[in-house]
């Protein structure tokens, strides 16, 4: 039986998500993917509410075995770091309310899993994930967030057997 893993690239305006089907750890197939687009015109609280609602709906419909996020990193702008942290909190809550464990990986770990090098550019990640999963739609310029989400899910598929389950965030 195949497991579904959901990678999420959080954002305050665009949140990319991708679900992969994993069989025997090495057979990885794209299942579904998309973006939650949040209007800049909405107050921040309403954007987080929309993010929570849409991701919760996807979690409910798909029932993934795990959710995977990037570890928090510090932007040059402290406000951006705080806002992104709040978006991550919304995603953690959505997953925890549905009892889906959440794992996190550093961006360079996910890039290394997808491309082979931890300092790969977003374009390199996009190209490699598109080729590995045979999803040409990922090459569109505005699909970088989805490619990052796929990279996170793929990273977990490869590293999950070595994860200490006590390290889950939820």
Curated annotation (Swiss-Prot):
This protein's encoding gene: ruvC
GO BP annotations, alphabetical order: DNA recombination; DNA repair
Enumerate the cofactors the protein uses: Mg(2+)
Q: What is its EC number?
A: 3.1.21.10
What name goes with this protein? Crossover junction endodeoxyribonuclease RuvC
Which key words are in the record?
Cytoplasm, DNA damage, DNA recombination, DNA repair, DNA-binding, Endonuclease, Hydrolase, Magnesium, Metal-binding, Nuclease
What does the record give as the function of this protein? The RuvA-RuvB-RuvC complex processes Holliday junction (HJ) DNA during genetic recombination and DNA repair. Endonuclease that resolves HJ intermediates. Cleaves cruciform DNA by making single-stranded nicks across the HJ at symmetrical positions within the homologous arms, yielding a 5'-phosphate and a 3'-hydroxyl group; requires a central core of homology in the junction. The consensus cleavage sequence is 5'-(A/T)TT(C/G)-3'. Cleavage occurs on the 3'-side of the TT dinucleotide at the point of strand exchange.
Q: Name one Pfam family in it.
A: RuvC
What is the originating organism of this protein? Chlamydia trachomatis serovar D (strain ATCC VR-885 / DSM 19411 / UW-3/Cx)
Residues given in the record as Mg(2+) 1 binding sites: 9, 145
Which InterPro entries does its entry note? RNaseH-like_sf, RNaseH_sf, X-over_junc_endoDNase_Mg_BS, X-over_junc_endoDNase_RuvC
Oligomeric form and interacting partners: Homodimer which binds Holliday junction (HJ) DNA. The HJ becomes 2-fold symmetrical on binding to RuvC with unstacked arms; it has a different conformation from HJ DNA in complex with RuvA. In the full resolvosome a probable DNA-RuvA(4)-RuvB(12)-RuvC(2) complex forms which resolves the HJ.
GO cellular component annotations, sorted alphabetically? cytoplasm; Holliday junction resolvase complex
Tell me which SUPFAM superfamilies the record gives: Ribonuclease H-like (SSF53098)
């Amino acid at each position: 039986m195949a497991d579904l893993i959901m990678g999420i690239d959080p954002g305050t305006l665009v949140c990319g998500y991708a679900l992969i089907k994993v069989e025997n750890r090495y057979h990885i197939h794209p299942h579904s993917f998309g973006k939650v687009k949040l209007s800049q015109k909405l107050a921040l609280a309403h954007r987080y509410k929309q993010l929570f609602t849409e991701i919760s709906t996807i979690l409910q419909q798909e029932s993934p075995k795990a959710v995977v996020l990037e570890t928090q990193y510090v932007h040059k702008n402290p406000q951006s770091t705080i806002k992104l942290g709040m978006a991550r909190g919304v995603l953690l809550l959505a997953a925890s309310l549905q009892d889906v464990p959440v794992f996190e990986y550093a961006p360079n770990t996910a890039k290394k899993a997808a491309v082979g090098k931890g300092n790969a550019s977003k374009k390199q990640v996009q190209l490699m994930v598109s080729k590995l999963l045979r999803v040409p739609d990922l090459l569109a310029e505005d699909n970088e967030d989805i490619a990052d989400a796929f990279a996170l899910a793929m990273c977990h598929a490869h590293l999950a057997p070595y994860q200490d389950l006590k390290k889950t965030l939820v």
